[in-house]
Amino acid sequence: FAAVPRLVVTGPSDGENVEGNSIEIAGFTDKDAKLTINEQPIIVNDRGEFKENVLLQKGINAIKISSTNRFEKSASETFNIKSNYQTPELANIESEGKVSGDEDARKSGVSVIVRAESVPTWLSVEADGNLIYSGTMLPGAIQNFDGEKEVRVTSGKANQTFVRVNGKAEKKLADDPGIVRDVVFTIGD
């Protein structure tokens, strides 16, 4: 007889409200268990602890955390997190026609807006060689990443990841449904 794995989520709490567009999910489980957040695999350290950033969309976000042991027994918890975040696209529409020095300065770098389509998607983003985001984007979540020379994107579900580079038309990161690593965007893109 095998027991279900232990799963303790230390944060966030169900029903939490956040002003931003991301939240850190943390807790612990059995060290040999397979952990997922919204069906995306998450690394568990050798003490069974986990910590993962999840990008949110505006409104209510359902986050399901599951832990499965080697006997295929599982435990899960579901949280509803409310985000009051305004997406970059909406902010751009509201400020259209207004030009400031900050906007002119930003145009000299690289701007990449990333959107997760219909499934939770793991994402890693580097700007100018520095890791600036690693976590899971929920469906519909949008995040803007800026770099001086380049922005490099790795996605766990490339065909569900859409990018808008330097204000140009949105496009799919790749047609491949799997992992695509180190797609580089530069000032000229």
Which role does the model predict for each range below?
Residues 1-86:
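Ser/Thr-rich low-complexity repeats and stalk/linker segments
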Residues 15-17, 92-142:
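Extracytoplasmic/periplasm-facing segments of secreted or lipoprotein envelope proteins
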Residues 18, 84-108, 173-189:
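Intrinsically disordered, low-complexity Ser/Thr-rich linker and spacer segments
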Residues 22-24, 49-51, 109-111, 140, ...:
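Transmembrane beta-barrel architecture of outer membranes
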Residues 26-34, 116-121, 157-160:
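Short proline/glycine-enriched turn/loop motifs at strand-loop junctions of beta-rich domains
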Residues 59-63, 110, 151:
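Exposed beta-strand face motif in extracellular beta-rich ectodomains
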Residues 124-126, 130-134, 138-189:
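Extracytoplasmic
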